[in-house]
């Protein structure tokens, strides 16, 4: 696969400690992808801070998935895809609504991306949900 670090960068939505959430500006496939990122290996650590942040990582993923199912695109998504990557010493969960695949992507690998203003609106709405975690 031809993934680059740019596929995991985007509009910063929320950060708490070492856990961060963004909306991709260069999605891999869909036009809307949420990245939830944490230091790699924290779930296996005995350190109290690592354990607390591992829990927060899981909670942030749940909030992102609920947002995709209930609010993004008017709550029309009935399912989602969730992928995990290790990149640059971090574990990144990439969450995206599951839609019928775009023929532009299948035939030409052209990803459809939302307008920046739409991404900013989604970022604000998702941030409000994530703020309830702390």
Show the residue positions of the predicted features.
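HIT superfamily nucleotide-processing domains
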Residues: 1-134
């Amino acid at each position: 696969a031809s993934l680059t670090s740019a596929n995991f960068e985007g509009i910063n939505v929320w950060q708490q400690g070492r856990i961060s959430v963004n909306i991709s500006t260069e999605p891999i496939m869909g036009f809307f992808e949420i990245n939830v990122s944490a230091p790699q290996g924290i779930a296996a650590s005995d350190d109290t801070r690592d354990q607390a942040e591992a829990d927060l990582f899981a909670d942030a993923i749940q909030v992102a998935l609920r947002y995709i199912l209930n609010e993004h695109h008017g709550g029309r998504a009935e399912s989602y895809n969730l992928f995990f990557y290790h990149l640059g010493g971090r574990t990144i969960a990439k969450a995206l609504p599951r839609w019928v695949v775009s023929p532009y992507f299948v035939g030409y690998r052209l990803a459809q991306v939302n307008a920046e203003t739409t991404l900013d609106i989604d970022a604000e709405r998702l941030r409000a949900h994530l703020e309830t975690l702390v």
